[in-house]
Protein backbone atom coordinates (compact mmCIF):
# COMPACT_ATOMS: atom_id res chain seq x y z
CA UNK A 1 0.00 0.00 0.00
CA UNK A 2 1.31 3.46 -0.85
CA UNK A 3 2.00 6.01 1.88
CA UNK A 4 -0.63 8.55 0.62
CA UNK A 5 -3.27 5.84 0.88
CA UNK A 6 -2.26 5.17 4.47
CA UNK A 7 -2.63 8.85 5.32
CA UNK A 8 -6.03 8.89 3.62
CA UNK A 9 -7.31 5.99 5.73
CA UNK A 10 -5.73 7.55 8.81
CA UNK A 11 -7.75 10.75 8.48
CA UNK A 12 -10.93 8.90 7.49
CA UNK A 13 -10.77 6.84 10.68
CA UNK A 14 -10.26 9.95 12.80
CA UNK A 15 -13.30 11.58 11.16
CA UNK A 16 -15.46 8.52 11.85
CA UNK A 17 -14.43 8.40 15.50
CA UNK A 18 -15.17 12.08 16.04
CA UNK A 19 -18.56 12.03 14.34
CA UNK A 20 -20.37 8.83 15.25
CA UNK A 21 -18.55 7.20 18.14
CA UNK A 22 -20.37 7.03 21.47
CA UNK A 23 -19.01 9.09 24.35
CA UNK A 24 -15.93 7.79 26.13
CA UNK A 25 -13.65 9.03 28.91
CA UNK A 26 -12.56 11.81 26.55
CA UNK A 27 -16.15 12.75 25.67
CA UNK A 28 -18.02 12.94 28.98
CA UNK A 29 -21.76 13.28 29.39
CA UNK A 30 -21.54 16.74 30.94
CA UNK A 31 -24.17 17.60 33.57
CA UNK A 32 -25.42 14.04 33.56
CA UNK A 33 -24.32 10.41 33.45
CA UNK A 34 -24.36 7.62 30.91
CA UNK A 35 -26.97 4.90 31.08
CA UNK A 36 -27.41 1.76 29.02
CA UNK A 37 -30.59 0.01 28.03
CA UNK A 38 -30.80 -3.14 25.90
CA UNK A 39 -29.94 -1.57 22.55
CA UNK A 40 -28.44 1.86 23.14
CA UNK A 41 -26.49 4.19 25.41
CA UNK A 42 -27.40 7.80 26.17
CA UNK A 43 -27.18 10.52 28.81
CA UNK A 44 -29.48 10.93 31.77
CA UNK A 45 -29.45 14.50 33.08
CA UNK A 46 -28.92 15.76 36.60
CA UNK A 47 -31.60 17.81 38.35
CA UNK A 48 -32.46 21.09 36.60
CA UNK A 49 -30.86 19.96 33.33
CA UNK A 50 -32.54 18.70 30.17
CA UNK A 51 -31.45 16.79 27.10
CA UNK A 52 -30.70 18.70 23.91
CA UNK A 53 -29.58 15.49 22.20
CA UNK A 54 -28.79 11.96 23.37
CA UNK A 55 -25.39 12.95 24.72
CA UNK A 56 -25.76 16.55 25.96
CA UNK A 57 -27.53 18.09 28.96
CA UNK A 58 -28.04 21.85 29.34
CA UNK A 59 -29.62 23.97 32.10
CA UNK A 60 -33.42 23.92 32.14
CA UNK A 61 -35.11 27.31 31.77
CA UNK A 62 -38.50 28.18 33.25
CA UNK A 63 -39.72 29.69 29.97
CA UNK A 64 -41.44 32.66 31.58
CA UNK A 65 -39.61 35.66 30.10
CA UNK A 66 -37.86 36.96 27.00
CA UNK A 67 -34.54 35.94 28.50
CA UNK A 68 -35.64 32.30 28.24
CA UNK A 69 -36.53 32.34 24.53
CA UNK A 70 -34.70 29.85 22.33
CA UNK A 71 -33.25 28.16 25.41
CA UNK A 72 -33.93 24.57 26.54
CA UNK A 73 -37.06 24.27 28.68
CA UNK A 74 -37.65 20.49 28.54
CA UNK A 75 -36.03 17.44 27.02
CA UNK A 76 -35.59 18.13 23.30
CA UNK A 77 -37.59 21.37 23.51
CA UNK A 78 -36.93 25.12 23.50
CA UNK A 79 -38.79 28.15 24.80
CA UNK A 80 -40.68 30.37 22.34
CA UNK A 81 -42.75 33.53 22.66
CA UNK A 82 -46.31 33.95 21.44
CA UNK A 83 -46.80 37.75 21.54
CA UNK A 84 -50.28 37.69 20.05
CA UNK A 85 -52.11 35.50 22.54
CA UNK A 86 -54.44 37.44 24.86
CA UNK A 87 -52.78 40.69 23.74
CA UNK A 88 -49.70 39.99 25.82
CA UNK A 89 -46.53 37.96 25.57
CA UNK A 90 -46.90 34.30 26.40
CA UNK A 91 -44.16 31.72 26.49
CA UNK A 92 -44.33 28.03 25.74
CA UNK A 93 -42.11 25.01 25.13
CA UNK A 94 -41.91 23.68 21.58
CA UNK A 95 -40.24 20.45 20.54
CA UNK A 96 -37.03 20.83 18.59
CA UNK A 97 -36.91 20.14 14.88
CA UNK A 98 -37.08 16.40 14.30
CA UNK A 99 -39.15 15.86 17.45
CA UNK A 100 -42.90 15.83 18.03
CA UNK A 101 -45.00 16.09 21.16
CA UNK A 102 -46.34 12.83 22.53
CA UNK A 103 -48.42 13.20 25.68
CA UNK A 104 -46.25 15.40 27.93
CA UNK A 105 -42.85 14.88 26.28
CA UNK A 106 -41.00 15.30 23.00
CA UNK A 107 -40.08 12.17 21.05
CA UNK A 108 -38.24 11.64 17.80
CA UNK A 109 -40.60 12.06 14.86
CA UNK A 110 -39.52 8.69 13.48
CA UNK A 111 -40.87 7.10 16.67
CA UNK A 112 -44.41 8.35 16.15
CA UNK A 113 -46.84 5.43 16.56
CA UNK A 114 -43.95 3.10 17.47
CA UNK A 115 -45.00 1.02 20.48
CA UNK A 116 -42.24 -0.62 22.50
CA UNK A 117 -43.88 -1.98 25.64
CA UNK A 118 -41.40 -1.92 28.53
CA UNK A 119 -38.78 0.20 26.81
CA UNK A 120 -38.46 3.21 24.54
CA UNK A 121 -38.23 3.96 20.85
CA UNK A 122 -34.88 5.15 19.49
CA UNK A 123 -33.83 6.43 16.09
CA UNK A 124 -30.11 6.96 15.50
CA UNK A 125 -30.03 7.41 11.72
CA UNK A 126 -27.80 4.35 11.38
CA UNK A 127 -30.00 1.36 12.23
CA UNK A 128 -31.04 -0.25 8.95
CA UNK A 129 -34.60 -0.84 10.16
CA UNK A 130 -35.12 2.81 11.13
CA UNK A 131 -36.68 3.44 14.53
CA UNK A 132 -36.22 0.53 16.93
CA UNK A 133 -37.03 -0.43 20.50
CA UNK A 134 -34.50 -0.34 23.31
CA UNK A 135 -35.74 -2.31 26.29
CA UNK A 136 -35.58 -1.78 30.03
CA UNK A 137 -32.99 -4.06 31.59
CA UNK A 138 -34.74 -7.36 32.28
CA UNK A 139 -36.68 -7.23 29.03
CA UNK A 140 -35.60 -8.01 25.47
CA UNK A 141 -37.05 -7.70 21.99
CA UNK A 142 -39.87 -10.14 21.29
CA UNK A 143 -39.92 -11.09 17.56
CA UNK A 144 -43.35 -12.64 18.07
CA UNK A 145 -44.80 -9.34 19.30
CA UNK A 146 -43.77 -6.83 16.62
CA UNK A 147 -40.30 -6.49 18.16
CA UNK A 148 -41.67 -4.91 21.34
CA UNK A 149 -39.99 -5.18 24.74
CA UNK A 150 -42.36 -7.80 26.09
CA UNK A 151 -40.05 -10.77 26.60
CA UNK A 152 -38.05 -11.53 29.74
CA UNK A 153 -34.33 -11.73 29.12
CA UNK A 154 -30.86 -10.59 30.13
CA UNK A 155 -28.70 -7.86 28.60
CA UNK A 156 -24.96 -7.77 29.24
CA UNK A 157 -23.62 -4.42 30.41
CA UNK A 158 -21.07 -2.95 27.98
CA UNK A 159 -20.27 0.24 29.89
CA UNK A 160 -16.56 0.62 30.66
CA UNK A 161 -16.49 2.26 34.07
CA UNK A 162 -13.77 4.38 35.62
CA UNK A 163 -11.39 2.84 38.13
CA UNK A 164 -13.13 2.11 41.41
CA UNK A 165 -16.57 1.93 39.77
CA UNK A 166 -18.53 -0.97 38.37
CA UNK A 167 -21.53 -1.44 36.14
CA UNK A 168 -24.70 -1.87 38.18
CA UNK A 169 -28.40 -2.15 37.43
CA UNK A 170 -30.11 1.02 38.63
CA UNK A 171 -33.88 0.83 38.30
CA UNK A 172 -34.41 -0.21 34.64
CA UNK A 173 -31.02 0.66 33.17
CA UNK A 174 -27.29 0.08 33.68
CA UNK A 175 -24.92 2.76 34.93
CA UNK A 176 -21.50 3.05 36.56
CA UNK A 177 -21.62 3.35 40.33
CA UNK A 178 -21.30 1.53 43.65
CA UNK A 179 -23.22 -1.55 44.74
CA UNK A 180 -25.04 0.46 47.40
CA UNK A 181 -26.45 3.02 44.93
CA UNK A 182 -30.12 3.41 45.73
CA UNK A 183 -32.94 2.76 43.32
CA UNK A 184 -33.62 5.57 40.89
CA UNK A 185 -36.64 6.79 39.06
CA UNK A 186 -37.45 6.64 35.40
CA UNK A 187 -35.59 4.89 32.62
CA UNK A 188 -34.37 5.55 29.15
CA UNK A 189 -33.83 9.15 28.23
CA UNK A 190 -35.65 11.34 30.71
CA UNK A 191 -34.05 14.30 32.40
CA UNK A 192 -34.54 15.78 35.83
CA UNK A 193 -32.86 13.17 37.99
CA UNK A 194 -29.83 13.49 40.22
CA UNK A 195 -27.14 10.88 39.57
CA UNK A 196 -26.95 8.11 42.15
CA UNK A 197 -23.86 8.20 44.39
CA UNK A 198 -20.54 7.82 42.59
CA UNK A 199 -22.08 7.62 39.15
CA UNK A 200 -19.59 7.27 36.30
CA UNK A 201 -19.56 9.03 32.96
CA UNK A 202 -17.38 6.87 30.73
CA UNK A 203 -17.94 4.20 28.13
CA UNK A 204 -15.77 2.71 25.45
CA UNK A 205 -17.50 1.07 22.53
CA UNK A 206 -16.09 -1.87 20.64
CA UNK A 207 -16.10 0.39 17.60
CA UNK A 208 -13.75 2.84 19.29
CA UNK A 209 -11.43 0.07 20.42
CA UNK A 210 -11.14 -1.38 16.92
CA UNK A 211 -10.41 2.03 15.47
CA UNK A 212 -7.67 2.65 18.03
CA UNK A 213 -6.02 -0.65 17.05
CA UNK A 214 -6.31 0.32 13.38
CA UNK A 215 -4.71 3.72 13.95
CA UNK A 216 -1.81 2.21 15.88
CA UNK A 217 -1.20 -0.23 13.03
CA UNK A 218 -1.26 2.56 10.44
CA UNK A 219 1.17 4.71 12.43
CA UNK A 220 3.52 1.72 12.82
CA UNK A 221 3.47 1.03 9.08
CA UNK A 222 4.11 4.69 8.24
Curated annotation (Swiss-Prot):
Glycans are attached at residue 87. A lipid is attached at residue 200 (GPI-anchor amidated glycine). It comes from the Eukaryota. Residues 201-222 form a propeptide. It is found in: Cell membrane. Residues 29-58, 59-107, 107-150, 151-176 form the EGF-like domain. It is a lipid-anchor; GPI-anchor. This is 28 kDa ookinete surface antigen.
Amino acid sequence: MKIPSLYFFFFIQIAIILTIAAPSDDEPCKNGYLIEMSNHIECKCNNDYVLTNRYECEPKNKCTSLEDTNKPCADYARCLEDPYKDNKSNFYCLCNRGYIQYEDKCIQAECNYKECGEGKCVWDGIHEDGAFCSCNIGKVINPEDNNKCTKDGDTKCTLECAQGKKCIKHDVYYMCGNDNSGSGSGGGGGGGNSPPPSSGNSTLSLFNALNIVFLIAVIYII
